[in-house]
């Protein structure tokens, strides 16, 4: 909902009631939002009454949206505001095959909206009307002071209704017009977790269809979750069960394996991501192959043509061009040069319990399997670190460095056996 009205006003007013503190905390730091408290909740008109003292009276129009109708599009909101330049009062309406329970839109012979009639008050002829009110509207700000002051709660629910403003507008000779949304899901409301789940599936399918229309290959468009913005280049392929959060950019020719989770990450062209990978706040250079079961944490940067294999974790580290980290390895707070091979089981020991330290590995270095690099430490260009080494001091360039206990064979030793 807030995404739909982004840019329409410098400051948006959010009316909160139930769990108000939690809602405000969720949007903490948003300088474009202000909050009005509605306690108790006494109808839609009452909600606007609470917002009225903090609304900008200099704005010619006031767009009223509903928090439980989350999928209003920016295009529909824009068309409503454009229509408001011709008609002061604009309703968002929709035609339904079965409008039972909804307020009907009554028009005169010229097609001008004259009233909203609730079903219980409608005549038999009015009940045949299929155009109904969604509750979303654009109102003339200059008239709101008088209209809100005139609202009454003399109904069975003792609530103040925004729909009563239509009658005030008609009495004042204000022209009322209506705009239809492009899609019915834009005005679907949510009153239960069942409805929320159903609408979420609708929205995910809408996003999946947009990707398909743009040329993205989705192995199963019903099994993808986009929880933010996903930007795809040409010839992208996404397997089943993938989740994209925040802003994710996939370059041309990227393939994403099944059940991968990618958050706030940029992936350049021709990258293959094998199944069950997890990326967050990372940057992946072109022609790389990652996974399966790889994790890129915030600050991980792969510069290109990198291999990051199974059960490898990279955090706050730069991996140079053509370097490989293929198996069972942790690279944290490190600068790894170009054409480096990091053997299985290598760990950059970057944390002493209080502080984090960096590891620097020069170009063309070879790190043997099961090496511990005790940071801060540097490995020179072209250096070789023998398997099983615990490196506590800098390793010189172009030389073999290793530390391991001398191998021994104990003559005459026998393995203990259990007593019978």
Describe the residue ranges of each PLM region:
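Glycine-rich hexapeptide-repeat left-handed beta-helix
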Residues: 272-420
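Acidic, glycine-rich loop-and-beta core segments that form the ion-binding/anion-interacting portion
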Residues: 223-304
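Conserved alpha/beta core of the MobA/IspD/sugar-nucleotide pyrophosphorylase nucleotidyltransferase superfamily
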Residues: 130-233
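Structural beta-sheet core signal
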Residues: 14-15, 63-64, 89-92, 178
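Conserved N-terminal catalytic core of the sugar/cofactor nucleotidyltransferase
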Residues: 1-82
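Conserved core of the sugar-phosphate nucleotidyltransferase
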Residues: 21, 25, 31, 72-156, ...
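Catalytic cores of nucleotide-enabled group-transfer and carboxylate-activating enzymes in metabolic
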Residues: 11, 52-53, 60-62, 76-77, ...
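Residue-level signal for inorganic ion chemistry
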Residues: 51, 68, 80, 105, ...
